[in-house]
Amino acid sequence: MQTAFCRYDLRFKAPAKTSRETLHEKTTYYIKVWDPSDPSRFGIGECALFRGLSADDREDYEDILATLCRRLNSSEPFDISRFSSIKFGLETALLDYENGCCRTPFPSAFTEGKESVRINGLVWMGTADEMTLRADEKIAAGFRCLKFKVGGVDFNDELRIIDRIRCQYPPEKLEIRLDANGAFTPDNAMDRLRRLAVLDIHSIEQPVRQGQWDAMAWLCENSPIPVALDEELIGVDDPDERRRMLYYISPSDIILKPSLCGGFSGATDWIDRAEAQGIGWWVTSALESDIGLNAIAQWTAAMHPSLPQGLGTGALYTNNFTSPLRLHGDMLGFDPAAEWVFPRLQWSL
Protein backbone atom coordinates (compact mmCIF):
# COMPACT_ATOMS: atom_id res chain seq x y z
CA MET A 1 0.00 0.00 0.00
CA GLN A 2 1.30 3.46 -0.93
CA THR A 3 0.39 6.73 0.79
CA ALA A 4 0.73 10.38 -0.26
CA PHE A 5 -0.59 13.75 0.89
CA CYS A 6 -1.21 17.19 -0.57
CA ARG A 7 -2.15 20.68 0.57
CA TYR A 8 -5.22 22.52 -0.71
CA ASP A 9 -6.29 26.11 0.03
CA LEU A 10 -10.05 26.57 0.23
CA ARG A 11 -11.34 30.08 -0.53
CA PHE A 12 -14.48 31.42 1.15
CA LYS A 13 -17.15 33.01 -1.02
CA ALA A 14 -17.64 35.62 1.71
CA PRO A 15 -15.77 36.26 4.99
CA ALA A 16 -16.88 33.80 7.68
CA LYS A 17 -16.93 35.48 11.08
CA THR A 18 -16.90 33.74 14.46
CA SER A 19 -16.18 35.13 17.92
CA ARG A 20 -12.57 34.00 17.43
CA GLU A 21 -11.71 35.36 13.98
CA THR A 22 -12.81 36.24 10.46
CA LEU A 23 -11.89 33.63 7.86
CA HIS A 24 -11.13 34.36 4.21
CA GLU A 25 -9.23 31.17 3.37
CA LYS A 26 -8.74 27.77 5.01
CA THR A 27 -5.85 25.43 4.32
CA THR A 28 -6.65 21.73 4.40
CA TYR A 29 -4.78 18.54 3.47
CA TYR A 30 -5.72 15.32 1.71
CA ILE A 31 -4.23 11.88 2.15
CA LYS A 32 -4.45 9.14 -0.48
CA VAL A 33 -3.85 5.38 -0.22
CA TRP A 34 -3.56 2.97 -3.14
CA ASP A 35 -2.07 -0.31 -4.32
CA PRO A 36 0.88 0.39 -6.68
CA SER A 37 -0.34 -2.40 -8.95
CA ASP A 38 -3.53 -0.40 -9.69
CA PRO A 39 -3.05 3.33 -8.94
CA SER A 40 -6.37 4.23 -10.59
CA ARG A 41 -8.15 2.80 -7.54
CA PHE A 42 -7.48 4.84 -4.42
CA GLY A 43 -8.99 5.86 -1.12
CA ILE A 44 -8.92 9.52 -0.13
CA GLY A 45 -9.48 11.35 3.13
CA GLU A 46 -9.25 14.91 4.39
CA CYS A 47 -6.80 15.81 7.15
CA ALA A 48 -8.98 18.77 8.08
CA LEU A 49 -6.61 20.88 10.13
CA PHE A 50 -8.31 23.92 11.67
CA ARG A 51 -5.62 26.50 12.37
CA GLY A 52 -6.01 28.09 15.79
CA LEU A 53 -8.45 25.44 16.98
CA SER A 54 -7.17 21.92 16.26
CA ALA A 55 -5.15 20.36 19.06
CA ASP A 56 -2.67 19.17 16.41
CA ASP A 57 -2.15 22.66 14.95
CA ARG A 58 1.63 22.98 14.86
CA GLU A 59 4.28 24.49 12.61
CA ASP A 60 5.65 21.11 11.54
CA TYR A 61 2.25 19.73 10.51
CA GLU A 62 3.33 19.05 6.92
CA ASP A 63 6.52 17.39 8.18
CA ILE A 64 4.38 15.07 10.32
CA LEU A 65 2.25 14.16 7.31
CA ALA A 66 5.38 13.51 5.25
CA THR A 67 6.82 11.31 8.00
CA LEU A 68 3.54 9.40 8.28
CA CYS A 69 3.53 8.69 4.54
CA ARG A 70 7.17 7.55 4.56
CA ARG A 71 6.56 5.26 7.53
CA LEU A 72 3.42 3.75 6.02
CA ASN A 73 5.13 3.28 2.66
CA SER A 74 7.90 1.31 4.36
CA SER A 75 5.50 -0.56 6.70
CA GLU A 76 6.88 1.16 9.80
CA PRO A 77 4.62 2.07 12.75
CA PHE A 78 3.66 5.69 13.42
CA ASP A 79 1.50 6.84 16.35
CA ILE A 80 -1.19 9.28 15.19
CA SER A 81 -3.31 9.12 18.35
CA ARG A 82 -2.44 12.75 19.22
CA PHE A 83 -3.14 14.05 15.71
CA SER A 84 -6.92 14.20 15.43
CA SER A 85 -7.16 15.74 11.97
CA ILE A 86 -4.64 13.27 10.53
CA LYS A 87 -6.43 10.36 12.18
CA PHE A 88 -9.70 11.60 10.67
CA GLY A 89 -8.18 11.76 7.20
CA LEU A 90 -6.39 8.42 7.34
CA GLU A 91 -9.43 6.60 8.74
CA THR A 92 -11.52 8.01 5.88
CA ALA A 93 -8.96 7.07 3.20
CA LEU A 94 -8.57 3.50 4.45
CA LEU A 95 -12.33 2.96 4.78
CA ASP A 96 -12.86 4.43 1.32
CA TYR A 97 -10.30 2.00 -0.10
CA GLU A 98 -11.77 -0.97 1.77
CA ASN A 99 -15.25 -0.13 0.46
CA GLY A 100 -14.37 -0.03 -3.22
CA CYS A 101 -12.67 3.34 -3.78
CA CYS A 102 -16.04 4.95 -4.54
CA ARG A 103 -15.95 7.67 -1.83
CA THR A 104 -18.30 5.64 0.33
CA PRO A 105 -16.33 5.01 3.54
CA PHE A 106 -19.60 4.30 5.38
CA PRO A 107 -21.98 2.60 2.91
CA SER A 108 -25.63 2.62 3.96
CA ALA A 109 -29.10 3.51 2.73
CA PHE A 110 -27.81 7.11 2.70
CA THR A 111 -25.17 6.37 0.05
CA GLU A 112 -27.80 4.45 -1.93
CA GLY A 113 -29.86 7.64 -2.10
CA LYS A 114 -32.66 6.15 0.01
CA GLU A 115 -32.24 8.18 3.21
CA SER A 116 -31.28 11.76 4.12
CA VAL A 117 -30.10 13.60 7.22
CA ARG A 118 -31.94 16.65 8.53
CA ILE A 119 -29.52 19.50 9.24
CA ASN A 120 -29.69 22.92 10.85
CA GLY A 121 -29.12 26.14 8.95
CA LEU A 122 -26.10 28.11 10.16
CA VAL A 123 -26.31 31.89 10.53
CA TRP A 124 -22.82 33.38 10.63
CA MET A 125 -21.98 36.49 12.62
CA GLY A 126 -22.31 39.85 10.95
CA THR A 127 -24.18 43.11 11.24
CA ALA A 128 -27.78 43.04 12.42
CA ASP A 129 -29.01 43.45 8.85
CA GLU A 130 -26.68 40.71 7.55
CA MET A 131 -27.70 38.19 10.20
CA THR A 132 -31.39 38.94 9.74
CA LEU A 133 -31.11 38.51 5.97
CA ARG A 134 -29.21 35.22 6.36
CA ALA A 135 -31.82 33.90 8.79
CA ASP A 136 -34.67 34.85 6.45
CA GLU A 137 -32.92 33.15 3.53
CA LYS A 138 -32.42 29.92 5.50
CA ILE A 139 -36.04 29.84 6.64
CA ALA A 140 -37.27 30.52 3.10
CA ALA A 141 -35.09 27.62 1.91
CA GLY A 142 -36.96 25.25 4.21
CA PHE A 143 -34.84 25.06 7.36
CA ARG A 144 -36.80 24.36 10.54
CA CYS A 145 -33.76 24.60 12.83
CA LEU A 146 -31.32 27.53 12.80
CA LYS A 147 -28.05 27.88 14.67
CA PHE A 148 -26.81 31.41 15.34
CA LYS A 149 -23.19 32.21 16.01
CA VAL A 150 -23.22 34.67 18.92
CA GLY A 151 -20.63 36.56 20.92
CA GLY A 152 -18.80 38.32 18.09
CA VAL A 153 -20.81 41.54 17.91
CA ASP A 154 -22.78 43.56 20.44
CA PHE A 155 -24.85 41.18 22.56
CA ASN A 156 -27.89 43.47 22.61
CA ASP A 157 -27.88 43.54 18.81
CA GLU A 158 -27.72 39.74 18.71
CA LEU A 159 -30.56 39.55 21.22
CA ARG A 160 -32.74 41.84 19.10
CA ILE A 161 -32.08 39.76 15.97
CA ILE A 162 -33.03 36.50 17.67
CA ASP A 163 -36.05 38.15 19.30
CA ARG A 164 -37.28 39.35 15.88
CA ILE A 165 -36.89 35.85 14.43
CA ARG A 166 -38.67 34.26 17.38
CA CYS A 167 -41.57 36.72 17.21
CA GLN A 168 -42.05 35.80 13.57
CA TYR A 169 -41.51 32.05 14.02
CA PRO A 170 -42.76 30.40 17.25
CA PRO A 171 -40.95 27.36 18.72
CA GLU A 172 -43.28 24.86 17.04
CA LYS A 173 -42.24 26.26 13.64
CA LEU A 174 -38.55 26.99 14.25
CA GLU A 175 -35.94 25.54 16.60
CA ILE A 176 -33.20 28.02 17.54
CA ARG A 177 -29.76 26.88 18.65
CA LEU A 178 -26.87 29.13 19.67
CA ASP A 179 -23.11 28.73 19.50
CA ALA A 180 -21.00 31.13 21.55
CA ASN A 181 -17.60 29.55 20.75
CA GLY A 182 -16.55 30.41 24.32
CA ALA A 183 -17.24 34.14 23.87
CA PHE A 184 -19.05 34.67 27.18
CA THR A 185 -17.21 34.99 30.50
CA PRO A 186 -17.99 33.28 33.82
CA ASP A 187 -19.09 36.72 35.07
CA ASN A 188 -21.57 37.60 32.31
CA ALA A 189 -22.66 34.19 31.02
CA MET A 190 -25.57 33.54 33.38
CA ASP A 191 -27.12 36.97 32.85
CA ARG A 192 -26.95 36.49 29.08
CA LEU A 193 -28.38 32.99 29.26
CA ARG A 194 -31.32 34.23 31.33
CA ARG A 195 -32.06 36.99 28.83
CA LEU A 196 -31.88 34.52 25.95
CA ALA A 197 -33.99 31.88 27.70
CA VAL A 198 -37.23 33.85 27.24
CA LEU A 199 -36.83 33.27 23.48
CA ASP A 200 -37.26 29.49 23.80
CA ILE A 201 -33.71 28.53 22.87
CA HIS A 202 -33.07 24.83 22.24
CA SER A 203 -29.43 24.87 23.43
CA ILE A 204 -26.22 26.86 23.54
CA GLU A 205 -22.82 25.47 22.63
CA GLN A 206 -19.71 26.32 24.66
CA PRO A 207 -20.86 29.53 26.41
CA VAL A 208 -17.45 30.07 28.07
CA ARG A 209 -13.94 29.26 26.95
CA GLN A 210 -12.85 25.64 27.29
CA GLY A 211 -10.70 24.53 30.21
CA GLN A 212 -12.83 26.23 32.88
CA TRP A 213 -14.42 23.10 34.28
CA ASP A 214 -15.78 24.68 37.47
CA ALA A 215 -17.45 27.56 35.62
CA MET A 216 -18.85 25.26 32.95
CA ALA A 217 -20.14 22.74 35.49
CA TRP A 218 -21.93 25.52 37.38
CA LEU A 219 -23.50 26.83 34.18
CA CYS A 220 -24.63 23.35 33.15
CA GLU A 221 -26.32 22.90 36.51
CA ASN A 222 -27.97 26.32 36.70
CA SER A 223 -28.51 27.57 33.15
CA PRO A 224 -32.12 28.00 31.98
CA ILE A 225 -30.88 26.91 28.52
CA PRO A 226 -29.39 23.42 28.01
CA VAL A 227 -25.61 23.71 27.64
CA ALA A 228 -23.63 21.62 25.14
CA LEU A 229 -19.87 21.12 25.16
CA ASP A 230 -18.06 21.78 21.89
CA GLU A 231 -14.47 23.06 22.00
CA GLU A 232 -14.21 21.43 25.45
CA LEU A 233 -13.77 18.06 23.71
CA ILE A 234 -10.77 19.13 21.61
CA GLY A 235 -7.48 17.58 22.65
CA VAL A 236 -8.99 15.32 25.32
CA ASP A 237 -7.59 12.02 24.07
CA ASP A 238 -7.26 9.98 27.25
CA PRO A 239 -10.37 7.79 27.80
CA ASP A 240 -10.30 8.27 31.57
CA GLU A 241 -10.03 12.04 31.16
CA ARG A 242 -13.05 12.00 28.84
CA ARG A 243 -15.11 10.07 31.36
CA ARG A 244 -13.98 12.32 34.22
CA MET A 245 -14.76 15.52 32.31
CA LEU A 246 -18.25 14.42 31.31
CA TYR A 247 -19.00 13.30 34.86
CA TYR A 248 -17.66 16.53 36.41
CA ILE A 249 -19.24 19.05 34.01
CA SER A 250 -22.38 17.00 33.28
CA PRO A 251 -23.55 18.85 30.16
CA SER A 252 -26.91 18.36 28.53
CA ASP A 253 -25.22 17.41 25.23
CA ILE A 254 -21.87 17.18 23.48
CA ILE A 255 -21.06 18.35 19.96
CA LEU A 256 -19.01 15.90 17.91
CA LYS A 257 -16.61 17.17 15.26
CA PRO A 258 -14.71 14.05 14.16
CA SER A 259 -11.81 16.00 12.65
CA LEU A 260 -11.27 17.75 16.00
CA CYS A 261 -12.13 15.10 18.60
CA GLY A 262 -10.11 12.04 17.65
CA GLY A 263 -11.36 11.00 14.23
CA PHE A 264 -14.31 8.67 13.80
CA SER A 265 -12.98 6.23 16.37
CA GLY A 266 -12.57 9.04 18.90
CA ALA A 267 -16.02 10.45 18.18
CA THR A 268 -17.55 7.00 18.61
CA ASP A 269 -15.84 6.68 21.98
CA TRP A 270 -17.24 10.08 23.01
CA ILE A 271 -20.74 8.92 22.06
CA ASP A 272 -20.40 5.72 24.08
CA ARG A 273 -19.22 7.61 27.17
CA ALA A 274 -21.88 10.30 26.83
CA GLU A 275 -24.74 7.83 26.42
CA ALA A 276 -23.51 5.89 29.46
CA GLN A 277 -24.08 9.08 31.49
CA GLY A 278 -27.38 10.05 29.88
CA ILE A 279 -25.81 12.88 27.87
CA GLY A 280 -27.14 13.64 24.40
CA TRP A 281 -25.10 14.42 21.29
CA TRP A 282 -25.19 15.57 17.72
CA VAL A 283 -22.61 15.87 14.97
CA THR A 284 -21.20 19.06 13.47
CA SER A 285 -18.80 19.56 10.61
CA ALA A 286 -15.89 21.98 11.00
CA LEU A 287 -15.45 23.76 7.66
CA GLU A 288 -14.23 20.66 5.84
CA SER A 289 -14.34 20.48 2.07
CA ASP A 290 -16.72 17.98 0.50
CA ILE A 291 -14.18 15.17 0.99
CA GLY A 292 -14.40 15.47 4.77
CA LEU A 293 -18.04 16.52 4.81
CA ASN A 294 -19.00 13.50 2.71
CA ALA A 295 -17.37 11.14 5.20
CA ILE A 296 -18.96 12.87 8.20
CA ALA A 297 -22.40 12.85 6.58
CA GLN A 298 -22.13 9.13 5.78
CA TRP A 299 -20.94 8.27 9.29
CA THR A 300 -23.72 10.34 10.83
CA ALA A 301 -26.43 8.90 8.58
CA ALA A 302 -25.40 5.36 9.49
CA MET A 303 -26.38 6.11 13.12
CA HIS A 304 -29.91 7.26 12.13
CA PRO A 305 -29.96 10.41 14.30
CA SER A 306 -33.31 11.86 15.33
CA LEU A 307 -32.14 15.46 15.92
CA PRO A 308 -31.10 17.93 13.20
CA GLN A 309 -27.35 17.66 12.71
CA GLY A 310 -24.87 20.51 12.26
CA LEU A 311 -23.52 19.42 8.89
CA GLY A 312 -22.33 21.92 6.32
CA THR A 313 -23.37 21.85 2.70
CA GLY A 314 -20.08 22.63 0.93
CA ALA A 315 -21.49 25.95 -0.27
CA LEU A 316 -19.01 28.14 1.63
CA TYR A 317 -16.13 27.84 -0.83
CA THR A 318 -15.49 28.98 -4.39
CA ASN A 319 -13.18 26.04 -5.12
CA ASN A 320 -14.80 23.09 -3.34
CA PHE A 321 -14.97 19.72 -5.09
CA THR A 322 -18.03 18.61 -7.04
CA SER A 323 -19.57 15.76 -5.05
CA PRO A 324 -22.76 13.65 -4.89
CA LEU A 325 -23.94 15.47 -1.76
CA ARG A 326 -27.29 17.15 -2.38
CA LEU A 327 -29.37 19.53 -0.26
CA HIS A 328 -33.16 19.53 -0.58
CA GLY A 329 -34.67 22.00 1.87
CA ASP A 330 -33.09 21.05 5.18
CA MET A 331 -32.38 17.44 4.16
CA LEU A 332 -28.83 16.52 3.18
CA GLY A 333 -28.73 13.55 0.84
CA PHE A 334 -26.47 11.66 -1.54
CA ASP A 335 -26.96 11.03 -5.26
CA PRO A 336 -25.28 7.69 -6.08
CA ALA A 337 -25.50 8.44 -9.81
CA ALA A 338 -23.47 11.65 -9.51
CA GLU A 339 -19.72 11.71 -10.05
CA TRP A 340 -16.91 13.34 -8.14
CA VAL A 341 -14.88 16.02 -9.90
CA PHE A 342 -11.43 16.57 -8.42
CA PRO A 343 -9.18 19.54 -9.18
CA ARG A 344 -5.57 18.88 -10.09
CA LEU A 345 -3.82 17.99 -6.82
CA GLN A 346 -0.06 17.93 -6.27
CA TRP A 347 0.70 14.81 -4.22
CA SER A 348 3.82 14.35 -2.08
CA LEU A 349 5.06 10.91 -1.05
Predicted regions and their residues:
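Short, solvent-exposed coil/turn elements at secondary-structure transition points
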Residues: 8-11, 125, 233, 287, ...
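A short pocket-lining beta-strand/turn micro-motif at the edge of beta-sheets
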Residues: 69-76, 252, 277-283, 305-307
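Catalytic core of soluble alpha/beta enzymes
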Residues: 153-294, 298, 317-328
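Oxidoreductase and adenylate-handling cofactor-binding alpha/beta cores
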Residues: 298-304
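Short helix/strand-capping turn motifs
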Residues: 304-315
